[in-house]
Amino acid sequence: FEFVKSINNRNKVLLAGVFLSPVDYSKVLAFTGMEGVALMPDWLMRNEDDVLVNSNIQVFEEACADEGIEYRVHKDTDMMAIASLIEETRFADLLLVSSDLFYENVQREQPNFYLEEVLKKAECPVMLIPEDYKEPEQNFLTYDGSESSVFAIKQFAYILPELAGNETILLSAVGHKDELPEYSMIAELVA
């Protein structure tokens, strides 16, 4: 939230808080009943997801109001939380995700399966924010040669021009720069 406050102090933002079920039930094995209908076991349906989500929404709304941040709330507590989040990214300029806490109730080690899914499938740039936020001094951008990675890099520059003066490091899963698709063009873009 400190990052959003910092950006909002420079340029007013509209913050959409997306509140998901604490578990993505689509990743949980379901029992198959008569006629192939998938049934969730009773023990799985007895949880306090809605109470937890509503509590988090209240904290979010109060924090936004206290800081003068315009906001919207999107509550997606259906059984396919990650799919709902991916759908939200189609209409977002930027997705901010806690690099420490994203679905840590399911798997503590980050990046966990859920975070990896979001990073692969998001339809807007994704920014991982640590819980002990400090103003960034460096930008780490990822590039895999795909059109979407170039688009995300360009969007980052358009959306957060105040970070463009930082040292920028381009990360790629490719072993050597000669193997990097369109190396000279991506180097020029991030220069």
Model segments located where?
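Small/aliphatic-rich secondary-structure junction motif
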Residues: 1-41, 121-124, 134-191
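A short acidic, glycine-rich active-site loop
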Residues: 39-54
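A general structural detector for well-ordered alpha-helical segments in enzyme core domains, enriched
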Residues: 4, 56, 60, 114, ...
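Short, flexible loop segments at the rims of nucleotide/cofactor-binding pockets, characterized by
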Residues: 71-76, 104-107, 148
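Short histidine/acidic/glycine/proline-rich micro-motifs that form metal-
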Residues: 46-47, 102, 173-177
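Structural beta-alpha unit
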Residues: 15, 20-23, 58-95, 191
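Active-site-adjacent beta-strand anchor residues
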Residues: 74-75, 129, 142, 171
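Gly/Ser-rich helix-loop-strand patches that form or flank binding pockets
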Residues: 1, 83-133
